[in-house]
Structure formats: structure tokens, C-alpha cells
Amino acid sequence: MGLIVQKFGGTSVGSVERILNVANRVIEEKKNGNDVVVVVSAMGKTTDELVDLAKQISAHPPKREMDMLLTTGEQVTISLLAMALNEKGYEAISYTGWQAGITTEPVFGNARILNIETEKIQKQLNEGKIVVVAGFQGIDEHGEITTLGRGGSDTTAVALAAALKAEKCDIYTDVTGVFTTDPRYVKSARKLASISYDEMLELANLGAGVLHPRAVEFAKNYGITLEVRSSMEREEGTIIEEEVTMEQNLVVRGVAFEDEITRVTVFGLPNSLTSLSTIFTTLAQNRINVDIIIQSATDAETTNLSFSIKSDDLEETMAVLENNKNLLNYQGIESETGLAKVSIVGSGMISNPGVAAKMFEVLALNGIQVKMVSTSEIKVSTVVEESQMIKAVEALHQAFELSGSAVKSER
């Protein structure tokens, strides 16, 4: 029939029992007459355990050696899953990222996929085998092993689906699909039957952990239909595709949130045409992702600049700014931790003015101070105190009527 790429995350392969369950799910797809490529993550908390081992040796281990270490986690999973499939009577072969032909840029820890040579995988598929590929890893032009960073296995799966021209890419997780918000925190959250690439990309960028943004970008660019499903349950998941026809004109489709956000403020920057370019180029060269940006001129000659980052990046951000003080020519810097980002997302915002005003009204009525704001055509993001994050999410979820059958859609 066709080719299906399946991806199973760390929780889904977290034990031998779960790997055997995954093998059964793979076999079901094979029995449907499809060729199957399976991408897997390291088992359970293996990656975290490997990081802990490294930190017992060195507080600042070389990035190359970290990639060498971390890629061993997926190698365990691929071999065990291939063994399970063969034991159940289905020929399977496992490949590391570099054996699978995945070439990346020469960056350790957060490389991007540049190309995938599919001949080896295609040969095995033509012979009727199931191909099991390690997610999260590849090889650069110098023959060095690299990792793809957070969400790398999602990206591997969608990139393989694009390169192999697969009909579909199924992302199996420990949840049954994409929800209007995280059901662990908001009990009234409901699963979406379908969602557009653009909406999913915004949700992923804004902290919805079910899919990595790079994976959604790949899917959108190559027209790959995604389905987020549970590896433990049999119910349908959430389809992610280009167009979604909704039963109702829902303005907002989801509320996303992310904790551990820090605001960095740079005081007394020269109020010149090049000062912003210089500071953000410097941060980008050090692979520091800046999110929400606010600029306020203090006088004709100087300006203050605030931007939000992930708290994990604070130490490096401050070091980069301090090391480049002469270049950037600022007067001072400070940081504010203990913040969170809360966002609403929905394509309906394009044709419905007043959404941001309603959001701010809801937050104000609940005594929640907004510290920073960012908007696009289909989202509004705010930075608030981390202690008020869940209160804000619950209030917005209720105000925009995201509970119940209204969130369902047709496809």
C-alpha cells in the first residue's frame, strides 16, 4: 500500500514490556500492507541519566564527548526493538542516525538536518524489512556524531517521512493527542480532532511539549500529514495538516504555557540604527534564542532593551553580554527570574478583532499582571509571574470556551 513512519518517545519505550507493546503496534501497521520505518528515542529517563553521569565527571564536559555519550541511549532502544520484531516473526534491521544517512550541520548538541540519503533504508524496505532508526542523531561532513537537541526524535521522524515521501508520520506519545491546553493542569481541557500546521507550530513554539517546532516546520514545508497518538490506547489522535474545517468559528484553539522564563534588561544602549542588530546578532552567534522583545527609549541618545529567554540560557546570556560590553556599549544589565509565558493561539484571530483586549481584560479581572506582550496574526503571548501561570491558563481556557464539544473539528 504505502509507507508509514512511526515515532515512539522515551515513555513509550521506557521498559522491555513497553518495547514489546511498541513492536505489536508496528506489526499492526505492517499487517495493513504498509512499509514501516520506526524512529525511537532513548528508553525512559536514559538521556537524563547519561547527562548526570557526565556531570559527575565534569561540570563542563566537551560538547563533542556529550554527543558521543548521549547517542548511546537510542542505540539501546533500536537494537531491542529490532530484536522484538524479529522474535515475533517480522524481519527488522536497526540503524543509527549516521547509518541511516542523516547528515547534519557541524554543530554539537543542537544540529540541524541538512540531508538524508535514503538508499540504504529504501533497499531494506524493498526487501520487506521493517527499518528501525535512532532518533535525535546524525553525522556531519567531518564524520563527527551530532545530536539534534530537544525534540530531535520528532524532527528525525518527520524528516525521514519527507525524504522517503511517506504517506503519513504518526507520532506516538504518552497522551492521546493535542489538547486545548495541558489536561494535567486544566481538567476541562479537550482533545482536538485536527489542527492546522500554523496553529500547531505556534503552540509548539509557545511551550506545548507534544511536538517540537522543527518537526512541525518540516511537516508544513513538505506537506507531511502528522497524527499525534497514544502508544498505550487505540483511540484516534489529532491530525495535523494544512487546512482544518471547524464546526464552529473558534477564535482561539488552544492555551499554551511555559515556565522558567527570565527577562533580561539591557540599560543605556546607544540609540543608533545598528545597536539592536549588533546585540541580537551577538546573541544569535552564541545560539541563544530570544523570544519577546520590548524597547523603550530613555532619551534621544540611549534606549533600554528587555527580552525574554529560557531560564536555562541565563548564565550564558549574561556571560555573552558581559564579554561583549565594549562592542555593545551599554551601561548596565539585570535579569528577572521566576516568570512564565502564557499564550492563546487560533487562526480565527485573523478575522476577529478584540481578542487581545479580551485576553488582557480576563487577566486583569483575575489580578494577573502582564509584564511583556508579543503578538502575531494567530497568537498573543504574555509574560506573567510564574506563581500565577496556572491561574492565568485556567481563566483564559474558560473565557474562550475551550471546554467540551466546541473544540472538535471536521477533516
UniProtKB/Swiss-Prot annotation:
Coiled coil: none
Record has Cell inner membrane as a keyword: no
InterPro entries in alphabetical order: AceGlu_kinase-like_sf (IPR036393), ACT-like_dom_sf (IPR045865), ACT_Aspartokinase (IPR054352), ACT_dom (IPR002912), AKii-LysC-BS (IPR041740), Asp/Glu/Uridylate_kinase (IPR001048), Asp_kin_monofn (IPR005260), Asp_kinase (IPR001341)
Regulation of activity: Lysine-sensitive.
Alphabetized CDD domains for the sequence: AAK_AKii-LysC-BS (cd04261), ACT_AK-LysC-DapG-like_2 (cd04923), ACT_AKii-LysC-BS-like_1 (cd04913)
Pathway listed: Amino-acid biosynthesis; L-lysine biosynthesis via DAP pathway; (S)-tetrahydrodipicolinate from L-aspartate: step 1/4; Amino-acid biosynthesis; L-methionine biosynthesis via de novo pathway; L-homoserine from L-aspartate: step 1/3; Amino-acid biosynthesis; L-threonine biosynthesis; L-threonine from L-aspartate: step 1/5
Recorded catalytic activity of this chain's protein: L-aspartate + ATP = 4-phospho-L-aspartate + ADP
Keyword annotations from UniProtKB, A to Z: Amino-acid biosynthesis, ATP-binding, Diaminopimelate biosynthesis, Kinase, Lysine biosynthesis, Nucleotide-binding, Repeat, Transferase
Pfam families tied to this protein: AA_kinase, ACT_9
Binding site for substrate: 25-30, 47-49, 74, 125-126, 150-153, 289-291, 295, 355-356, 369-370, 376-377
A cellular component annotation (GO) from this entry: cytosol
Oligomer status and interactors: Tetramer consisting of 2 isoforms Alpha (catalytic and regulation) and of a homodimer of 2 isoforms Beta (regulation).
Protein name from the UniProt record: Aspartokinase
Gene encoding the protein: lysC
